[in-house]
Amino acid sequence: MKKRSLMKKYAAVMMAAVMAAATVTGCGSAGGTETTTAAETTTAAETTTAEETTTAAETAPETTAAETVPVTTAAPAEALREEVEGIVDEGFEMAAEAYLAAPQMLPAAKQYAGVSASAAADTWNGMIFPGGEPAAPQWNTEEYDYIKENGWRAVSASPFATFAADVDTASYANIRRMILRGQAVPADAVRIEEMINYFSYDYPEPAEGEPFSVTTEIAPCPWNEDTELLLVGLQAKKPDMEKLPASNLVFLIDVSGSMDEWNKLPLVQRAFLLLAENLDENDRVSVVTYAAGDTVVLEGVRGSEKAKITAAVEDLMAGGGTNGSAGIKTAYELAEKFFIPGGNNRVIMATDGDLNIGVTDQGSLTRLIEEKAKSGVYLSVLGFGEGNISDARMEALADHGNGNYSYIDDIAEARRVLTEEAGGTLFTVAKDVKLQVEFNPERVKGYRLIGYENRVMAAEDFADDTKDGGELGAGHRVTALFEIAQPGSKQEIGEPERKYGKGSGNETRTDGAGGQKNTQDPTAEWCTVSIRYKDPAEKSSGRDDASGQESILLEYPVDNTAVKPEMSDDLSWAAGVAQVGMILKNSEYKGSTELSGVTERLAKTAHASDDSYRRAFLYLTDRMARAE
């Protein structure tokens, strides 16, 4: 009943948006020389099927803001109402996708009202309802941590760039939602590394026995003629879905009052049922909900018991306060109770992050998660909704819980995270992954790490196995970009004056070898990429205290063979995504970046037309450019 009421609420909003266009243009009568009926008009929702895995933006109209269509008489209100309700009856999945992708409503709004695409967009984004009055603004209490962009570092003073791997993609999906809805994007909501890592790249598969491959490339920077870009790319081994270990999953679902929105709990339910479809008799599933208190809805049932899992998830209803800490404790207790040695033991938390009962401060929650992570149970955090999401809290929980953080803005994104990339989301192939790039002052005078601001580590923490890194899932990729300046570059670095010799500062190796790196030809190598990780298969049969496990060190010198006269398609795409991120942040480092130029360049790269996620990104950049 709750789902039906939310679906009807959605239908009313959808109806109001379509009718608003007719009201604004005064085309509200049923008369006229040309009649467009509801049956003759195809809305975006009708062309979105459950089998499609593309995001809503990919099927956005190809019309421009300047295009108009002949004025036609609007369909009668009752006919529109019947059509919209019919669309909803065809499936909540279709409704969710259509609503979240407001631009997809433009063709229908144009045909119903005979207005231009730009006018229809203004009507939708402003939510002007019949009568010409805009809808009352909703409170927005979304929380994002302050991000201070990484600046230029002088190699003479700081030759080491050290940071933890990050495979989260929440930031991109979240800002996509804002752009599609015509909302302003907060600068602190933009984490450029998560935007870059959302996309796949043509990195080679790792060699036999290796958890990941490493790709490096140096090419001219597209926004600064005085610098180059260094790409460091990791590609984890793609999973053989037929040989994956058994899973012990605990669905930890927020059913508090704040989840009582159609794009929160109902979307959570759809998402978890998608995941459950791929489980079998070797897997275990538990369901824990939390509101004012916590409830065990399902305990350790086999993945093959589809009917039982479906009934448990579909019967959930939202209401009450949010005692997330109680739910977290119970979820980990169940995960430990049904622990599968050598298997995938994971809590999957679905929430908007709005916690107001029990342990609520971020510091205490982080310590709680850190303690629970020692059990060998991993954590995936799925963020839902808008208006009150606590992005900072959800990211912190995932980072300290040996996990990953994704934002689910529609059912297509749920399908991408939980089915298409289930291996990466659910199965860890390398844990506590840390990267350290040591730059050669003979080749590089300064560098700037793009993104990863909240993953930067002290140089000495690289070799300290008690310091947490990031987790790399099966098939996941990590891409890091550095803007670098050669000694002869005009780029200002801000190198400090030094009174004493070169032996001070952090100019010592941190891999335990001691002393400076010995190289026969110091001009040949630009830098050395060092990576540390831990094998998740070790000590997986019991409590897994990361501080007691020794990491594995890999080193990859970067010499002139990595230098290219022009960017490869992979580097060009990653650089373009970074440029868009810098525009959204109004970065002081964006240089000559212009959206039109970025879009034009990216459209020429490989996979720009055959990769649905890249097509969607190009649509976003075009939409941003037209809104300027």
For the regions a protein language model found, what residue spans apply to each?
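N-terminal secretory signal peptides that target proteins for export/translocation
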Residues: 1-7
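Sec-dependent N-terminal signal peptides
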Residues: 7-18, 29
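C-terminal motif of bacterial Sec signal peptides marking the signal peptidase cleavage site
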Residues: 22-26
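Exposed acidic/Ser/Thr-rich ligand/metal-binding surfaces
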Residues: 28, 214-432, 491-517, 608, ...
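Short, low-complexity, disordered segments immediately C-terminal to signal peptides
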Residues: 28-55, 59-64
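Long, acidic serine/threonine- and proline-rich intrinsically disordered regions
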Residues: 86, 93-99, 103-120, 125, ...
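Acidic/polar low-complexity segments with low predicted structural confidence
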Residues: 144-228
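Polar, glycine-rich mid-to-C-terminal structural blocks
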Residues: 378, 400-409, 414-479
